[in-house]
Structures are given as C-alpha cells and as structure tokens.
Amino acid sequence: MQSVEDLGLLKMDFLGLRNLDVISDSLELIKETVGVELDIDNLPLDDEKTFNLLALGESIGVFQLESPPMRALMRALAPSSFEDVAALVALYRPGPMAANMHNDYADRKNNRKPVEYFHPDAEELLRDTYGLMIYQESVMRVAQKFAGYTLAQADNLRKAMGKKIRSAMEKERESFTSGMESMGYDTKLSEEVFQVISQFADYAFNKSHSYGYGLVAYQTAFLKAHYPVQYMAALMTSVKGRKKEDSAIYLNECRHMGLEVAVPDVNTAQMNYYPDIKSGNRSPRIVYGLSAIRNVGEGIVSLLISERNSNGPFVDFYDFCERVDLQVLNRRAIEALIKAGAFDSLGHTRQGLLASYEQIIEQTVSRRREKEMGVMTLFEVAPDDVSQVFDDKVLIPEIEFEKQQRLSFEKEMLGRYISDHPLRGYEGTLRRKCDATSQGVSSLDEGQVIKVGGVITEVNKKQTQRGDLMATISLEDLEGEIEVIVFTKAMAQVGHKLATDRPVIVTGRVDRRDENSKIICLEVEELKSDQESKVTSIDVRIPATGTTTKHLENLASLLSEHAGECDVYVHLGSKRIWLGADVRVDPDSGLLGELRVLFGAECILT
C-alpha cells in the first residue's frame, strides 16, 4: 500500500456503518409516529438532555460509546460539549489509555487535576484539550508555533506520526530542534518538546476522524435521549438476523429504560420492530417484528400485513384463517406465530391453538378451495358472517402451558425471552453478587477470576479420553449467553448442581484463547431471588494503598446518589466502620458496579 501512495495515487477507505441505517430508520419512524421531520444534519450541538444521557453512561446502543469501559469513562468525564464527545473517540484507544491520557483529560476537565502545559506558549494551542496533544493536528500546530514549520512540513510530521514511522520521526528530530532554537527557544526545551511529540506520535489521532465519528455518536445519543421508542426499535431491527447476543443486550436496555418490548402481534406488528405509541392509556412500547420470527418469511409477513391494512384487524383465529392468502396458512409458519405469541391478543391460549390449528387450517383451506372451484354449500349460499361458515368449526380448547414452557417456545422462535424472563426478580442479586455479565467477559483479562450469574439453558456432559466426566453448559443472563466449561475436578464438586432452567452463580476463570470468550468453572452456587436474598447492609473494602482523597470524595458522591435503606460498612485495614444512619443506600440501583469501578472488583464483601 505504501508503494501505491508513493506513486501519487489516492487511497480512500470507505467504512460501512450499520449506525447510519439506524439513524435513517429512526428518522422515518419518528416521522410516521409523531409527524416530526428531524433535520439530523443540523441538530443543536449543545443539547442538555443528550449530555445528561452521556454523563450518566446510559449509552448502550450509541455509536462508539456503548462498551462498559467507555461508559465508565463518560461517567468520570461527564461530557458537556461536542468537543468532549469527539475527544472520547480519540482517547478510548490502546495508546492514550496506556498513557493514562483518558483519565488525565477527565480529571483536568472536572478540576480534579490542574491543567498543565509543557510551556506557557502552548496554552493558546492546547487550551481546548486541557494541555494534552490528543490529535495529530495539535502536534502540527505545536510544530508550526515552536519550530517554525511550514504547513507542508507539519503535514509530513503528521504523516510520520499517523503511520507510526519511527525512522521518519527520528529524521524530524534534527530539523525540529534546530527550528525551535531559531525561534528563540533553548536546546533543552527543544529536546523536551520533541520527546513529548515523539510520545504522542504513538497515539495522536486524526481530528477530522474523531469529529466525524463524534458527530455520528452525538446524533445517535440525541435520538436515544429524545425519541427512545423509535430509536430503540430501529436499533433492534438493525441487529435482526445477527448473533442473538446483540439483540439480547438491546432488549435488556429497553427494559432498563422502562420500555416494554411486546411479543409479535398479528394485529399490530409490522415487518420490523415498530414503536407502538398509540396504545390508549398504555405507555409507548416496541412491538416485535413479524419477520424476526423463526420460520416466518418476509413474503408471508407482507401478505398478512396487506390483508390487515385492507380489511382491518383480525377478530379471532378463525377470522384470520378465512381472510389471509392461502400461502400464509403454512403449517410451519403458523406454528411459529403461535409459539411466539402472535395470536395472544385474539383471546386464544398458545397451548389451545397448538392443539387445534392444523385441523382448523385443513378445514379452512379445503372449504376455500372448494369455493374457488365453484362448489357451494348445501344451501348454495355464501354467508357473510364468518361464524356461520364454522357451524361445525373445530373448537380451540382453553388450556395453557406453564410459564416456563411458554417462555421456552418464545425463545425457540424469537431467539430470546420477550414476555418475561426466568431471571426476572433476580436482577438485584445479580448486581450485588456478580462481577460481570455474559457480554462483559470479553473485555476482561485472560485468567481473571470472576462471578457470572444466570440460568442454565443447556448441559452437555461427556467423557474424557481417560473416562472421566466433564461438561459444557450454556449460561444465560439478561444480556446474552456464555459457554462455561466444567473440567473433571470441578465436575466432581458441582456436577449435581448442573440442571437446565436452574438459576446459578458460576465462579470461574476467563478464557479468551478462542474467538468467543468462555469461563472455566471453579465453583457453582445457587442464585437466590431478590426476595430471598434481600440485604440490610453492604460492606465495602477500601484498598489500603493507592486510595486518594478524590477516591473518598467519589465514594461519598456515589453513596449520596444511590440513597436507600441499606446500612453501609467500610473496611479499612482490620477495621469495620459503620457510616451511620444518615448514609443508607439502595444496593440494587447500580451502586455496586460503580463501587467496583472505583475500588476494584473485589471491594464488595456483602
């Protein structure tokens, strides 16, 4: 690729972003549902609601800003301008993070550290980035100001940095230092400044790239803050057909936001996820897309929606069978619709429909085909009332599955639990007891020992070559699934606890050697519901070394933000200190995760 550039040819990278489709789909849904034509290219870049969302770290689904470490950084930085958003894009990369620039930027912005410049003359150049050269353009301006570089010379310096060409950087040293001396700066300072620039060469980022990505990040955050139902519907549509963990994360985020995601409904659902904001007294919700149901193709969905749009909602299952195109009455597709709950609103039970739908379809198809061929009823009259056609109709029994079976069928057809979840009522315990979620494991260190909670959805036991027993299990939490490997030694201790549909907490080591992260099981314990494991106090260990006054200030702020009914005890060395009746917290509000970010994963002793 270097030879192509040397020939003078232009090299351009084109990046296809799914998020651009999410933005355009959101704009269409906003126009359809509330009649607002939003000009996405001219949004106000000082929107308070958007910055509040980002400062709280509520950025799941926001371009570039949704990973757990990024959300933690945003809470520390509290972005309040578009420039902060662009800086986040540049800072959240291995180089700047290894140099602790991301924390320096956050601390300097919020007056936790003084803003320092390598020379007073640099203030006018680096004031907007708090004295840090986080962009290549910052380095170019320093070279022009301090070494008298022309714009072309500064651009050559930028190229050397951007391509990480160390040899080219060394060639620049002599011209840079001599240039600074000619500008009246001493030799020592010139060496120091070039050394600073050389360090930044490892991670300085292109400003136009950061601002371009930052704008898309801001636009998606704005849409989530102001039009959450439409945005989340478009976001979930964008991951339709992708790995199910993606949609599970966004489904859980909808629940966190207080948005209901309803099972698909033959009377209200569209091809894709759709915001249902005209629901009478009910809060706005998102209805699951019909085409996202397993075994239900887009062709069938188009025919179904066409009939509904032409002749109104379906009255019951008999009416549905009588009206839709015969292609829709595909047994495989109808079974999938039933299991997914798409006929629930018609007043039928899922078990009742599964017991009778084949006979109803057979009866309907036979009669409709006879009618098409000119075969009339006994009285040679076609009644207008569908119920008259079904004088001998097959009855739908009023029987229903147990909750677990209904949810199992939902997951089979939709890839995830929608109407409910086996872990509903366990959320607080999961936050208190666990260090990570299934989807957070991939960002942890190899070999790190963690606790992850969930429900066991699959157990596969097998014998090793030596005849010993081991197992692999699928553990599902509210964000997705992760594979847990139980080797022989652990199997002897915990094998009796491994059963499908059982809520458990797994203690294990992170294994990231393969493409998909796994957990090597060490222990398994029962996961108790929030009601069973209700706590009256929490214990927080504060490290004896490395804890600063700022850490303690952040602790006080967190405890104040998460006020509740639980007492708080702080462990300092061998002392256990009660913080008093005025300091009580809600441990299920996300506090424990914040404390782990502040003091480390092992700080919660409760």
Per-segment meaning from a language model:
Residues 1-606:
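Noncatalytic, beta-rich nucleic-acid-contacting surfaces in large DNA/RNA-processing enzymes
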